[in-house]
Amino acid sequence: MSSPPSSLDELIAALRCLPGVGPKSAQRMAYHLLQRDQRGAARLAGALGHALEVLRHCQRCNNFSEEAVCQRCANPRRDPATLCVVEMPADLAMIEQTQSYNGLYYVLMGRLSPLDGVGPRELGLERLIARATDGEVKEVILATNFTNEGEATAHTVATLLGARGVKVSRISRGVPVGGELEHTDTGTIAQALVERRAF
């Protein structure tokens, strides 16, 4: 029995790095891109290459940006006194869709997960602490997910910032326990922000 070409194996292995994509899904995607949608494959490869080339992390909020400081952080209409901490860019996007928050953000790009080797240092919490204690921020709103890891992250951040005299609040549990902001409707997120509590 002959094995597939090594370039095909490499493509399938590369697609498996995506979240939720197992070997069968990766194989189906590879075959589809190569056989049915070569233009789409070329566009995907080009867009990914371009994004890797031009995107970096904003120096203030840690979100993806093409500039040293992203447009949101540079916007003088945003309230610099409140800093909302989220796990991922998708969480920030969901909060923005509610149109109920006008402060600034800090994107952790993950959450504490000791079993996966992600501790405070790996998450870069020292950058968050520096940002939250820069003199502009009056309140930090913790909007991490209501999962075990999200709760542990919120608790750790609250402890670190509270020890430095920073006012810390937590979004309300209008977001379902075990739920993730990315999969929550905007009305629920808006209510959770309005009904946040001290943490």
Curated annotation (Swiss-Prot):
UniProt keyword annotation of Mitochondrion present: no
GO MF annotations in UniProt: DNA binding; zinc ion binding
Domain of life: Bacteria
Ranges annotated as C4-type zinc finger: 58-73
CDD domains: TOPRIM_recR
SMART domains to which the protein is assigned, alphabetical: TOPRIM (SM00493)
GO biological process, one term: DNA repair
Positions of the Toprim domain: 81-176
UniProt keyword annotations, A-Z: DNA damage, DNA recombination, DNA repair, Metal-binding, Zinc, Zinc-finger
InterPro entries attached to this UniProt entry: DNA_Rcmb_RecR, Rcmb_RecR, Rcmb_RecR_Znf, TOPRIM_dom, TOPRIM_RecR
Matching Gene3D superfamilies: 3.40.1360.10, RecR Domain 1
Entry function: May play a role in DNA repair. It seems to be involved in an RecBC-independent recombinational process of DNA repair. It may act with RecF and RecO.
Family per record: Belongs to the RecR family.
HAMAP family on file: RecR
Protein name per the record: Recombination protein RecR
Native source species: Azoarcus sp. (strain BH72)
